[in-house]
Amino acid sequence: MAERANLVFHNKEIDGTGMKRLISRLIDHFGMGYTSHILDQLKTLGFHQATTTSISLGIEDLLTIPSKGWLVQDAEQQSFLLEKHYYYGAIHAVEKLRQSVEIWYATSEYLKQEMNSNFRITDPSNPVYLMSFSGARGNASQVHQLVGMRGLMADPQGQMIDLPIQSNLREGLSLTEYIISCYGARKGVVDTAVRTADAGYLTRRLVEVVQHILVRRRDCGTIQGISVSPQNGMTEKLFAQTLIGRVLADDIYIGSRCIAARNQDIGIGLVNRFITAFRAQPFRAQPIYIRTPFTCRSTSWICQLCYGRSPTHSDLVELGEAVGIIAGQSIGEPGTQLTLRTFHTGGVFTGGTADLVRSPSNGKIQFTENLVHPTRTRHGQPAFLCYIDLHVTIQSQDILYSVSIPSKSLILVQNDQYVKSEQVIAEIRSGTSTLHFKERVQKHIYSESDGEMHWSTDVYHAPEYQYGNLRRLPKTSHLWILSGNICRSSIASFSLHKDQDQMNTYGKKDREIFDYSRSDRIMANGHWNLIYPSIFQDNSDLLAKKRRNRFVIPLQYHQEQEKELISCLGISIEIPFMGVLRRNTIFAYFDDPRYRKDKKGSGIVKFRYRTLEEEYRTREEDLEDEYETLEDEYRTREDEYEYETLEDEYGSPENEYRTLEKDSEDEYGSPESKYRTREGEYGTLEEDSEDGYGNPGESSEDKYGTLEEDLEEDSEDEYDSSEEDSILKKEGLIEHRGTKEFSLKYQKEVDRFFFILQELHILPRSSSLKVLDNSIIGVNTQLTKNTRSRLGGLVRVKRKKSHTELKIFSGDIHFPEEADKVLGGCLIPPERKKKDSKESKKRKNWVYVQRKKILKSKEKYFVFVRPAVAYEMDEGRNLATLFPKDLLQEEENLQLRIVNFISHENSKLTQRIYHTNSQFVRTCLVVNWEQEEKEKAGASLVEVRANNLIRDFLRIELVKSTISYTRKRYDRTSAGPIPHNRLDHTNTNSFYSKAKIESLSQHQEATGTLLNRNKEYQPLMILSASNCSRIGLFKNSKHPNAIKELNPRIPIQEIFGPLGVIVPSTSNFSSSYYLLTHNQSLLKKYLFLANLKQTFQVLQGLKYSLIDENKRVSNFDSNIMLDPLLLNCHFVHHDSWEETLAIIHLGQFICENVCLFKSHIKKSGQIFIVNMDSFVIRAAKPYLATTGATVNGHYGEILYKGDRLVTFIYEKSRSSDITQGLPKVEQIFEARSIDSLSPNLERRIEDWNERIPRILGVPWGFLIGAELTIAQSRISLVNKIQKVYRSQGVQIHNRHIEIIIRQVTSKVRVSEDGMSNVFSPGELIGLLRAERAGRALDESIYYRAILLGITRASLNTQSFISEASFQETARVLAKAALRGRIDWLKGLKENVVLGGIIPVGTGFLKFVHRSPQDKNLYFEIQKQNLFASEMRDFLFLHTELVSSDSDVANNFYETSEPPFTPIYTI
């Protein structure tokens, strides 16, 4: 020890890691016994110091960080800029969230680093610093919360809240910050409670699966090894950690000299020699093969050499050591510890941000520009990227600073720029981040104000959202919310304000405004009426323009009609809001007034179908035949009713009309067999009959006979449904959520139909009736206390559980002479006399012979005859009457056909609300394509608002593609030079874009009239070429080179001028924004603008006209204003007209703060009036939306504050704190497939199993395939588990994990390919056992590798006692008894259960009988070890060991590739 006295005296503090290193070196040098004495003295010293020092912790010890103020200010400045960008629409919401999270996270991290250095420099003996940084109590992040800032938090859903907590716990939190931080705290408390139990259970399962693994033998004799080499991307630290304590599997040579022999254990000295060798010759050095538990050849134990050194002392593990239990506990224990360490943020954003380089002082920055090249940061800001390490100099007044910036960093300043102190000058790329787990998150953006939605690019009507109002964005674009709120007066008779007037915003509060705004959206009741009621009467010009691909029908919605259930005369359109028209879809119907039932009431409709395939039978046959035919024709035939229903992706239509037969029998319980046979003879149907209402057993009925009337079952909903709903499926119509289709196959034609009056009263059960069942009454007879009949005729009463039904059939009882001649259920035409009837006079009307039971009553037959009203069906009307000739002489290409159908079911009682009309026949317009049903058309209601008028269009696009989209024309076609202070969108004419010409000619849009909502409309002017001319935008002398040639091929519609041909004359707006001004000057016929040097003609007689974005012309009548939108307008005065024409056009959107003229624009918005000396901007807010975002709502739809606008889908990093990490570890151990297991291991094993036998051929293939598969998966699993633990700074030796993974992967499953005599297919056996059995039997056993979870592995051991004490006791024991299993009691648990000596430690030796040669080998190795340990130098260790800086340790484990590559010597 004498030479040791000359050593350097170290005077420095020692922390937890330093203490660990000291102890390990003491053990290496002095051995276990001596070290324990030293440590005992250390402990006494520590307690003594603690007593004398008596550290106390006061609030003064919490030193705040001086740099916090400007750091937070800096971050706030950046956030403010971000907010502004977002407000201008330059970035979208997700980007804003991401960047603000990043800004604040970087600030918080920088503060943390500052805090460390601040403590170290100012007060190294500070109690807070001492406790937290020595590892005694608390950790860095907790101290950071105390004296730094709490930083970002997550909400309960795990989403980031982008409002950071700027204060720390020493300063105290504001109320908002307190509430935000409560989320994380609560999550932490819950996690602690839940996860601690999980961690304990994990430990139990881990110990269970490996409890029988102990060191039983010196050497298993394996010749395999796993190669380790720093070339695989391992850091030297990790390399050293992997090697120390292992045993070499092969000799190691440097050059020709062997420096280490096989089976030698590796110490720190040997590792340092390896590292120096690798540094000297990185590519020539051979990989090092080591033995691991994976390479051990034993089945249920492990040998000393494959395990390596004991974790407690630097010698080989002793025989009889229970290494399995040690491994299970080493892995499980950190889990319990880590769950107790509740995270301060509850799953906050961790990692992944770049480190920042800040300038040391004010000065001018300089660097070599050749070494950098321009690029953009991930947020799109310009920066320089440097390839190699770059030295940057900052020249302050007296000092020259040099800052080194590592390669691949981004430089955020320019050369020769003046930088301030602590300004960020560069961003260092972070290494591989620990966040490989991504999750997809939706973020909804809500509107911040009321207004209308506009968008400025194509928006797809995505096919999967056909019925919704969701649209996909194909490319990044802006959505604009044009501000304005709706003020609807109840009566639109008079308004003080003229069109375009400025209204005083305070005015509306004084008088009450009835707000119909919500209910009055266009969807109000599902039916819209065209405003041309006289379409069918005369050939009026319905301005529905027929185009090849689209037509528009103007609609009008009457508010006062909401209360009416029946639509008034005219065409009604029945379309879902975003409906799809297929072939044969009905899209409109017309109710012919001739088929309108009078207001009196209800009855039955009778008709006969004539199918298209059938020949039509003429009625010019003889009388008898005609009698038969008639009966045939007018009887309902159920077999024609039973059509197939088409089921497609919208689901099958519900069958609302149940069959009657069962119901009636069950309800009234009367046997109908007798009656049924008679029906069979006559070929009629069950519906035509219903049993008597009374009890059939009554004698009176037997005596006199009762009458049966044909009625279908009464479904309760039949009486109160509005008439539109009873368009039946039985005509071959199929309903799909509002669209109806014909199936042509089953279409029937009807010549005429009949209406028979009939009345139904549904009365409460308790009401007393004034009339008897089966009696005949007259009109207006009193039925109950307060109801009277409207018809005369026969009364039937049916009592049900909840109510009483009373029916009155109009008509008379008629007594025929002979029963055989009269057939029930037929209709008799008026001209024919009835042979057998007593009356001989001709009847004017048709009659209907009610179906009857023929019961003899005093030798008389009787039949019930009812009057019927006949309606003839005429042929379908010609389409030419529907649509006038197209004014633009386009060919008729819209395929519509007209179909009439009866809207009531045959023989079904139609009951309507009294005093309303009911419609019998409905004429439908059906979309008719020649091709098959591939074609679809989208129908949408377009609501166009031009200033104060709201017009609704039904737009039907008959496009070939499934995705149709509306194009709004804001494309830039800039031409000519622009002065510097101008906007870069030059003279875009918003209605003309060169790029769209070709496609427009294919999909023409129609121009339809826009109808005023209050029943007055101006006629639409179709402008021909003589009416309009193009305004040249660049005709003034300032831009001589920029004159554009007119494109002669542009269709006339495209070349309206920037103001839509109409330029209003100058109005004098005063600077007061609330002044009411009036636009009353009429336009002259010719308006001459001196600056433009060009005259152009204006439509005369109109006060104002505008073409809106869809190129539709609208004319305003400024005397009537129904729904004034209170527009927030903003005036911009500019000097002369010529200056602006190059820049501004109507409908253009302008962002805030754009410098158009000498003044800045103070609000963003849309230009919507342009006058000679000023223009008006309607305030609007832009929202940027990215590709693939979903837009909610329609173009021009009114949105209210808080309505959802856009939904973004973006990926965000999942934070990997241990509360999520522990379940990951467990899932890997349990071999469950989870998303974040990057390559799913089970799938990988399948692949290996399949491919390798194919490559190598069968008998060998299985053996090698299974081995390689297992080896591959083992290494991958070890790396994954280590990654989770290392990300938490927990260090577990690989060999513990290896022992457990070895158990999980050691089984193979016998496959069915080759039958063997030993194992049954599907049986799980150990891999080594399978190999040995194959060798012993001289036949190949086919098997494949399998990945068991730890639970399944615990239930597949050799000991059934251990399995039974783990789980499923009864099942395990019963199986074991049936199989006659034997337990050899090799493990610990079996022996503990049975009370035997456990076979480890001292109880181990009686099992082992060493052979003498074994002993010699053992002593030789002992000598080798002694020699090697004496070679180690204590000081050598002290200097060479990796530095104790704890920050470095965290960066060592980010290896992306697996550190091991297996090697096999076979």
UniProtKB/Swiss-Prot annotation:
<keyword id="KW-0150">Chloroplast</keyword>
<keyword id="KW-0808">Transferase</keyword>
<feature type="binding site">
    <location>
        <position position="306"/>
    </location>
    <ligand>
        <name>Zn(2+)</name>
    </ligand>
</feature>
<dbReference type="GO" id="GO:0003677">
    <property type="term" value="F:DNA binding"/>
</dbReference>
<dbReference type="Pfam" id="PF05000">
    <property type="entry name" value="RNA_pol_Rpb1_4"/>
</dbReference>
<feature type="region of interest" description="Disordered">
    <location>
        <begin position="618"/>
        <end position="725"/>
    </location>
</feature>
<feature type="compositionally biased region" description="Acidic residues">
    <location>
        <begin position="639"/>
        <end position="651"/>
    </location>
</feature>
<keyword id="KW-0240">DNA-directed RNA polymerase</keyword>
<dbReference type="InterPro" id="IPR038120">
    <property type="entry name" value="Rpb1_funnel_sf"/>
</dbReference>
<feature type="binding site">
    <location>
        <position position="296"/>
    </location>
    <ligand>
        <name>Zn(2+)</name>
    </ligand>
</feature>
<keyword id="KW-0934">Plastid</keyword>
<dbReference type="GO" id="GO:0003899">
    <property type="term" value="F:DNA-directed RNA polymerase activity"/>
</dbReference>
<dbReference type="GO" id="GO:0008270">
    <property type="term" value="F:zinc ion binding"/>
</dbReference>
<dbReference type="InterPro" id="IPR050254">
    <property type="entry name" value="RNA_pol_beta''_euk"/>
</dbReference>
<keyword id="KW-0862">Zinc</keyword>
<feature type="binding site">
    <location>
        <position position="303"/>
    </location>
    <ligand>
        <name>Zn(2+)</name>
    </ligand>
</feature>
<protein>
    <recommendedName>
        <fullName>DNA-directed RNA polymerase subunit beta''</fullName>
        <ecNumber>2.7.7.6</ecNumber>
    </recommendedName>
</protein>
<dbReference type="GO" id="GO:0009507">
    <property type="term" value="C:chloroplast"/>
</dbReference>
<dbReference type="InterPro" id="IPR007081">
    <property type="entry name" value="RNA_pol_Rpb1_5"/>
</dbReference>
<dbReference type="InterPro" id="IPR012756">
    <property type="entry name" value="DNA-dir_RpoC2_beta_pp"/>
</dbReference>
<feature type="binding site">
    <location>
        <position position="220"/>
    </location>
    <ligand>
        <name>Zn(2+)</name>
    </ligand>
</feature>
<feature type="compositionally biased region" description="Acidic residues">
    <location>
        <begin position="707"/>
        <end position="725"/>
    </location>
</feature>
<keyword id="KW-0804">Transcription</keyword>
<dbReference type="GO" id="GO:0000428">
    <property type="term" value="C:DNA-directed RNA polymerase complex"/>
</dbReference>
<feature type="compositionally biased region" description="Acidic residues">
    <location>
        <begin position="621"/>
        <end position="631"/>
    </location>
</feature>
<dbReference type="InterPro" id="IPR007083">
    <property type="entry name" value="RNA_pol_Rpb1_4"/>
</dbReference>
<dbReference type="GO" id="GO:0006351">
    <property type="term" value="P:DNA-templated transcription"/>
</dbReference>
<dbReference type="Pfam" id="PF04998">
    <property type="entry name" value="RNA_pol_Rpb1_5"/>
</dbReference>
<dbReference type="GO" id="GO:0005739">
    <property type="term" value="C:mitochondrion"/>
</dbReference>
<keyword id="KW-0479">Metal-binding</keyword>
<dbReference type="InterPro" id="IPR042102">
    <property type="entry name" value="RNA_pol_Rpb1_3_sf"/>
</dbReference>
<keyword id="KW-0548">Nucleotidyltransferase</keyword>
<comment type="similarity">
    <text>Belongs to the RNA polymerase beta' chain family. RpoC2 subfamily.</text>
</comment>
<comment type="function">
    <text>DNA-dependent RNA polymerase catalyzes the transcription of DNA into RNA using the four ribonucleoside triphosphates as substrates.</text>
</comment>
<comment type="subunit">
    <text>In plastids the minimal PEP RNA polymerase catalytic core is composed of four subunits: alpha, beta, beta', and beta''. When a (nuclear-encoded) sigma factor is associated with the core the holoenzyme is formed, which can initiate transcription.</text>
</comment>
